[in-house]
Amino acid sequence: LRTAVDCLTLTATPIPRTLQFSLIGARDLSIMNTPPPNRQPIQTEVQVYNEDFIREAIYFETERGGQVFFIYNRIAGLAEMAAIIQGLCPDLSIGFAHGQMDGHLLEERIFDFIDRKYDVLVSTNIVESGVDIPNVNTIIVNNAHQFGLSDLHQLRGRVGRSNKKAFCYLLAPPMSTLPNDSKKRLQTLEQHSELGSGFQIAMRDLDIRGAGNMLGGEQSGFMAEIGFEMYQKILDEAIRELKRTEFKELFKEEIAKQDDFVQDCTIDTDLEILIPDDY
């Protein structure tokens, strides 16, 4: 950290627009790749909803002394989903929690889960941030195709917070029935399950969603006429100029390095370099 930094943003997976600001140089970017000691990668699998599989995954975790998150992101059917899980695992204690519960009741439910009064907590994605329960090492996300990539990565981060092997199961309809974007999101989570993969996931999210509607009809100005590549070049030049004028004290080290390299190269020659007639 430097005293010259006025605002520091910390994120596991930057949203595409924020990431784009860093990639074009409008914001500095630092990546922390070193995980806490003794952490293991979270085994991530995409599965079709199957009650036998759910029962097996829950009992595998509870029999080794752990607990389970079951994510169901519809408040209206949350109690019914908890009843289904209770029917699958009648000898286990099942609780449920969501954001519209009374604050005291919600807090009590979470603390009861931390105190191991429940084996399984059926919850909305309210638990995706700020929850650190090392004994929970299996998370099952129902209808995972309806979640965004960053949401799924945050939910997966609720497990594997100790030295135990953790599991994340993403339940979704068969891949062949899903839209392309949903399919890409699930495949990305399954492929990038190693520690410190948040940046790769964010880059894939940028690739899937784009950095914003740059050339759409809502945009004003002349960008649609000059094209995206020229726009990026003009934007890059404007950022470099600002760094050398208004913010030169902040970026003096970067400017010194840039001065050692040629940014653009112009060749002036008498030779004719044209596309041949027979092309």
Where are each of the predicted segments found?
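C-terminal helicase module of SF1/SF2 nucleic-acid helicases/translocases
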Residues: 9, 51-69, 73, 77-80, ...
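Post-DEXD/H (motif II) to motif III coupling segment of the RecA-like Helicase ATP-binding lobe
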Residues: 1-67
